[in-house]
């Protein structure tokens, strides 16, 4: 199978079939489609809950943190949480997901009270989101725990122009047997005159 990838492809990519011919054995994939395809082929299938379900689960985790640990770092959010549970849960979950997407390890305490608060809440939260799935996929491929032979991933962008996560993902996919082809880097052309 050949996956033609660009992080800038959306859900619907126009393909001129008169010029292209058949699409059998090919798939055009944006970011989420590539992640989904590689997760499926790595045996990491999962159904993600919607954002409101995750927010509700995070609210429960915050409540549990307050209830079970009176001296928790999360106490800094108690007053705000008492006034707007949903808003605070949405904000903190957004912070958490952004940090997970950047490789945050919630087991290492830091000098940051807010990070430590998120770590305390994390102990009561088990509801994976997109950032968790991306991290799990990258870790699985980097550990060589998938067989991706028979897959060709053709990046529309040169390797140096890919966002960091996707550059690492394609490199890890290559180590698992996928053939990865990058478009050539654009050459610099001097203006005439």
Protein language model regions, located:
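Conserved RecA-like helicase ATPase core segment
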Residues: 164-193
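Histidine-centered acyl-transfer/condensation active-site motif
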Residues: 151-161, 173
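Short, hydrophobic beta-strand segments that form beta-sheet elements in well-ordered domains
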Residues: 1-14, 154-156, 181-182
């Amino acid at each position: 199978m050949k996956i033609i990838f660009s992080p800038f492809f959306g859900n619907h990519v126009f393909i001129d079939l008169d010029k292209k011919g058949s699409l059998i054995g090919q798939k055009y994939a944006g970011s989420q489609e590539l992640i989904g395809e590689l997760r499926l082929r790595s045996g990491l299938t999962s159904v993600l809950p919607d954002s409101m379900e995750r927010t509700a689960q995070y609210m429960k985790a915050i409540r549990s943190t307050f209830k079970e640990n009176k001296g928790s770092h999360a106490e800094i959010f108690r007053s705000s949480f008492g006034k707007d549970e949903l808003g605070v849960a949405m904000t903190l979950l957004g912070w958490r997901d952004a940090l997970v997407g950047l490789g945050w390890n919630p087991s290492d305490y830091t000098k940051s009270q807010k990070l430590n608060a998120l770590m305390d809440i994390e102990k009561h939260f088990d509801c994976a989101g997109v950032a968790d799935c991306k991290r799990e996929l990258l870790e699985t491929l980097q550990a060589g725990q998938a067989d991706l032979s028979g897959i060709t991933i053709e990046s529309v962008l040169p390797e140096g122009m890919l966002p960091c996560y996707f550059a690492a993902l394609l490199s890890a996919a290559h180590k698992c047997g996928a053939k990865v082809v990058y478009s050539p880097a654009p050459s610099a052309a001097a203006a005439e005159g």
